[in-house]
């Protein structure tokens, strides 16, 4: 058993999966209505005990760094662009490096990380370089997310990085 931090957690699918695996879960999203929806999903799933946090993810992680908190797993599904609850502007290309630098400080040495990226401004090579910069010699993998179309074209959707 360990703890999982789900950032940009939206309606909580990953939070529920982690809780069902008997993990302590912290679910962070900046939109109160979305966190309420996730809490309803927890009730429908007959699970209990997820910690709900309505806050800017970067601010939350920054405080966790100061507290010396460590997580066994961190899940990140940041939007390409967004506006936080207090009007904070989020642009993935500008903030991802800072976010990963701080996340690296709260991920336990043998912990796992899943990062989903949906931005045309970031390539798999950029994500690979960021992972090397902030997670050093830890083993990780990068994959592209895509769909096959009815016309036999591959449609790019995003990138996933996993430790």
Named regions from a protein language model:
Residues 2-10:
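Conserved class I S-adenosyl-L-methionine
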Residues 16-19, 65, 100, 104:
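A structural alpha-helix within SAM-dependent methyltransferase catalytic domains
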Residues 107-108:
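Helix-to-beta-strand junctions that scaffold the AdoMet/dcAdoMet cofactor pocket
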Residues 11-23:
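Conserved SAM-binding loop of SAM-dependent methyltransferases across substrates and taxa
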């Amino acid at each position: 058993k360990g703890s999982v931090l789900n950032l940009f957690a939206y309606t909580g699918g990953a939070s529920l999966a982690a809780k069902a695996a008997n993990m302590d879960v912290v679910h962070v999203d900046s939109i109160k209505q979305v966190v309420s929806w996730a809490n309803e999903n927890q009730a429908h799933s007959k699970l209990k005990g997820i910690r709900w946090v309505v806050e800017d993810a970067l601010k939350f992680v920054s405080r966790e760094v100061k507290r010396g908190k460590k997580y066994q797993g961190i899940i990140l599904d940041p939007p390409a662009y967004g506006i936080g609850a207090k009007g904070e502007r989020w642009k993935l290309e500008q903030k991802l490096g800072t976010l990963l630098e701080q996340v690296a400080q709260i991920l336990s040495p043998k912990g796992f990380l899943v990062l989903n990226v949906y931005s045309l401004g970031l390539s798999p090579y950029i994500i690979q370089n960021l992972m090397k910069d902030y997670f050093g010699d830890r083993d990780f993998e990068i994959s592209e997310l895509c769909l096959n179309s009815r016309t036999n074209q591959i449609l790019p959707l995003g990138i996933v990085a996993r430790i």
